[in-house]
Amino acid sequence: MTPAEIKRLYQIIKVQLEYGLDELLPDHQLTKAPLLMRKSLFWIKNKHPEKPLGERLRLALQELGPVWIKFGQMMSTRRDLFPPHIADPLALLQDQVAPFDGQLAKEQMELALGGPLQNWFTEFDIKPLASASIAQVHTARLKDTNQEVVLKVIRPDIRPVIDSDLKLMHRMASIVAGAMPEARRLKPVEVVREYEKTLLDELDLRREAANAIQLRRNFEGSEELYVPEVFPDFSNETVMVSERIYGIQVSDIEGLEANGTNMKLLAERGVSVFFTQVFRDSFFHADMHPGNVFVKPEHPENPMWIGLDCGIVGTLNSEDKRYLAENFLAFFNRDYRRVAELHVDSGWVPADTNVDEFEFAIRIVCEPIFAKPLCEISFGHVLLNLFNTARRFNMEVQPQLVLLQKTLLYVEGLGRQLYPQLDLWETAKPFLEEWMMNQVGPQALVNAIKDRAPFWAEKLPELPELLYDSLRQGKAMNQRMDQLYQGYRHSKRQQATGKFLFGVGATLVVCSAILVDNAYEQLSIASGIAGVTFWLLSWRAYRR
């Protein structure tokens, strides 16, 4: 380790001890030395003993800085690995840090765009509109159209910090996984690797721009969701320019009510937007926390969601979508056998899983949920219960389902915050049933033909030639089959002849032995020679 890494490691340990996070260390032979060092070398006491462990963990991560804040946010979504008293406080982590110098931000933008900002923008505000751990946002106007825009720029000093902390995270995860077998259940190495991929993706604003363009295209003309326009000509790896929007933050209940917003419709549209993204588009915004969701102030009787920050998205293939929809329908019909079979059929759990035991485990965990009215049942917790149960049956981590679960919890939480009586199942069931009908009914056949139409249009001119080749190959194959059949029949005849000759030869040899005993020497010799001759003929017949 370099001196800088050692210094950073000491800072991390110091903060952890100040918040008493050594309590997270299990009672293990290997943890005795660190606990002894805590008392003998560091002399650092827990400064917040009155706070719950989960809250202390949140405060410690917040103090350690942006990389650890985002790591905590990701941990809060992995409820299959972390218990509620840890995951719930981590969900409150706020990704807000002090802004860096606006002049430095301007220089970074000009370096990325290849010229002075006044070449393309006017009214650039040196004061940031918002600041987060990865990037900072400033406002301006497009010079050609006078349209208001926001310029998002990656922090210039963030990459070395991220690389350094990620190295430490990987080292610590490897040590924990190697030294404590019982800790491997939490999969520390895989968790850090997943986090690294997510974090590095957020450092490339081209990815976010592409995601926003795709999401905007998917909901073009929709009354439910609006995604601000991105200007790709001014966007690259470290800078992204998009349309500036004005809206009411979705968590501002008082502001929404003061504006006369139809809260019931707004909540139901949130559910509709989620299921449309998942089942129609197979492409969903996976970071829909309240800071990224606004509501248009115009037409409050017909409210529209606004989605920002498309850095994290999820995708599902057609098999995942079908199994997910069938799982929901089977669960709410209390068909636990079907739920178990679907997990096996989808490959989410091993093929040799005992379906009877799996069904029983699902029933024990999920049946108490139905003691509540349907309007009080949480979709997100349904998924959580299913995945946690499946984990006991060696279900592999499905990253796309983890993102889906996190997003569903966000959407469900926002929906019930807006309209506490929201019946998520009543809103979602018609959508799921219609989607399933489209997958297995006549419409599914029509859709499949439409999807394959370009392929067949391309192959149509080649069809006569392909048909001729198929007929020619079929004729050649028939001839070959005839030859093989004739050879087979000839072989069977030869085998029958060989068996007959062998039997005659054996009979003559036996007769030869009998004749010797009865003093018919010459006849015995002749019979023996004839028997051997028939054996040779039978061997020759087999050879053919």
Curated annotation (Swiss-Prot):
Locations listed in the record: Cell inner membrane
Binding residues for ATP: 129-137, 152
GO MF annotation: an example: protein kinase activity
Domain of life: Bacteria
SUPFAM superfamilies xrefs: Protein kinase-like (PK-like)
TM helices/strands, residue ranges: 496-516, 519-539
Protein kinase domain location: 123-501
Biological-process GO terms, alphabetical: regulation of ubiquinone biosynthetic process; ubiquinone biosynthetic process
Protein family per UniProt: Belongs to the ABC1 family. UbiB subfamily.
Record-linked NCBIfam families: PRK04750.1, UbiB
Role played: Is probably a protein kinase regulator of UbiI activity which is involved in aerobic coenzyme Q (ubiquinone) biosynthesis.
Name of the protein: Probable protein kinase UbiB
